[in-house]
């Protein structure tokens, strides 16, 4: 669905729910924040450094009649993660959904060149933040039930490459946390699943992938093109709805144009 079009599908059981989307200023997170708002959810929109982009997105959501809270935090710092979740839940008085989307590669570094500092930075941002945000959200989600959706990656299954191996490993952690958390939380009415995007045209690849690397990746996609942020939105909305996916937990939906078929 192009960003300037209203998604025609209305999912009735999403309206009115409070959803926190982390890493939501641009890319997949930004598309999700807008999509949830179009479903009449109340959206907590987290960003780290992209303040202007986040404010533009929040303004667009408000122009469309949506209810949105902007909240800033560095998700490599656990205290920031905790504060963002608490701010969001307390602002709206409740929380029904958490989308753990914040993350990044933080540079392409071969395994032979890894430093302890790089390991800590990547794992804190991509792995620890998911645990911290979920832990803080669980008491709120338990009140009425809800969902957690984690953003993992095609790199979690294919080992990544080109210096992205540690990023892929951090996302493999997230995929397995998704399964374990799903088993623990379903008894409280909290469904946990994940979405694994493939090669998606977002600021992520603008930052970390050269034109040559992108061309090589696209050549491996049967559908013949890289994906867009909006290509990913439907999987998240599907997993957010008890009506559509109430018997689905602990699953990772691969959104990659056939680039990986596990």
Language-model regions, residue ranges each:
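Catalytic loop of short-chain dehydrogenase/reductase
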Residues: 105, 147-173, 178-187, 199-200
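A short, exposed helix-loop element centered on a Lys and neighboring polar residues
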Residues: 134-135, 179
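Substrate-binding pocket helix/loop in short-chain dehydrogenase/reductase
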Residues: 109-111, 115-120, 217
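C-terminal substrate-recognition "lid" of short-chain dehydrogenase/reductases
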Residues: 92, 228-255, 260
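Conserved glycine-rich Rossmann-like NAD(P)H-binding loop of the short-chain dehydrogenase/reductase
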Residues: 41-56
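The beta1-alpha1 cofactor-binding region of Rossmann-like NAD(H)/NADP(H)-dependent oxidoreductases
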Residues: 51, 72-84, 116, 231
